[in-house]
Amino acid sequence: MKKEFEVIAQIIQNNKRVLDVGCGDGTLMEYLKLNQRNDVRGLEPQKDLVQKCIARGLSVIEGDAEKELIQFPKKSFDYVVLSQTLQAFLYPEEVLDQLLRIGKQTIVSI
């Protein structure tokens, strides 16, 4: 697992609801689920990566965060994670606003 993911995992407490935005192949999600007993969900725009996550037994939906995050209720997750994805957005400020709205705590790494 990448060092960055190790740092993020140290921040997140056990038995929490976590949303991983731009979750990639689900490496961080799988760790948080198996080692910390977190209820982890993912949002990923790339169909092939969504399929990899599903094959790992992870709960991931395919979608664009700039369009999909608005649908999540306020403070519906204990933690929202955005790792190495911010630069990919056309409107990063709006994405950050949504992350702060959805999560009780938000973790962003660049």
Residue ranges of each PLM-predicted region?
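Conserved beta-strand signature within the Rossmann-like core of class I S-adenosyl-L-methionine
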Residues: 103-110
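Class I SAM-dependent methyltransferase SAM/SAH-binding core
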Residues: 27, 31-68
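A conserved beta-strand element that flanks and buttresses the S-adenosyl-L-methionine
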Residues: 81
